[in-house]
């Protein structure tokens, strides 16, 4: 005998670091499935987790139920260790739940070290960079929020206090909250005494492991005048005061065209 009703509940819990949009949708096969919100996306102020509970009536339905929604990584992912997770459980009565299914994802980071010549050979502070997504320094640069000197995270959309400027210190500069992909850094602000016609633009490829969250970075493609190099997993970026201080590859390349 068939059922007149067949209640089916789905609970979704998104971790701290995710902003859940109320755009849940469901299908069985190619047919849209209606549902009601038992609990609309609700953030727990203590844990930062967002819980949503949906109720379906699956009487007379068969097939795989697929539920989709979108979420945006937010600033809290940094304090959450660059990791977000999503947990789903199902129930017939909204009380007894199946063991949870957990999905985890990570964002990553990379570092670069800015240095000059002479007294600045160990670190050059005050140089400004813009960061562009992709293999070219074109379009609108990404915006960041400064966490501390030399530490920046990707800004949320329209976040107050965000800026496209990343400023070097005498130590490493860390750029956090990024997904895997290519990023191009272009020097846009200079330190007095250094040549403005010999400035670095370079592209890195960031790979974030979704197994353990580790980040790896390599130089690829664009590397103007050879001023960037990869040493001990940190991108080393040089500024010079004259052509004789360029790395050999950059000096040779410049000589060919002068």
Positions of PLM-derived features:
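Solvent-exposed loop/turn and edge beta-strand elements of beta-rich ligand-binding domains
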Residues: 1-258
């Amino acid at each position: 005998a068939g059922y007149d009703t067949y209640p089916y509940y789905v609970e979704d819990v998104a971790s701290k670091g995710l902003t859940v949009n109320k755009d849940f949708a469901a299908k069985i096969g190619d047919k849209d499935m209606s549902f009601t919100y038992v609990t609309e996306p609700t953030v727990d102020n203590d844990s930062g987790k967002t819980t949503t509970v949906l109720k379906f009536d699956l009487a007379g339905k068969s097939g795989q139920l697929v539920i989709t929604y979108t979420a945006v990584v937010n600033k809290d992912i940094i304090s959450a260790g660059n990791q977000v997770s999503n947990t789903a459980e199902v129930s017939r009565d909204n009380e007894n739940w199946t063991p949870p299914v957990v999905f985890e994802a990570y964002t990553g980071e990379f570092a670069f070290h800015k240095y000059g010549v002479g007294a600045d050979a160990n670190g050059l502070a005050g140089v400004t960079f813009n960061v562009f997504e992709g293999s070219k320094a074109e379009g609108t640069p990404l915006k960041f929020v400064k966490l501390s000197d030399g530490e920046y995270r990707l800004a949320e959309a329209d976040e107050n206090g965000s800026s496209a400027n990343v400023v070097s210190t005498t130590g490493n500069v860390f750029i956090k909250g990024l997904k895997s992909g290519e990023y191009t850094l272009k020097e846009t602000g200079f330190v007095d005494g250094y040549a403005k016609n010999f400035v670095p633009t370079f592209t890195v490829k960031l790979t974030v492991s979704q197994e353990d969250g580790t980040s790896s970075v390599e130089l690829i493609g664009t590397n103007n005048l050879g001023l960037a190099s990869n040493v001990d997993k940190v991108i080393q970026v040089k500024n010079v005061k004259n052509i004789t201080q360029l790395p050999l590859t950059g000096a040779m390349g410049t000589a060919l065209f002068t």
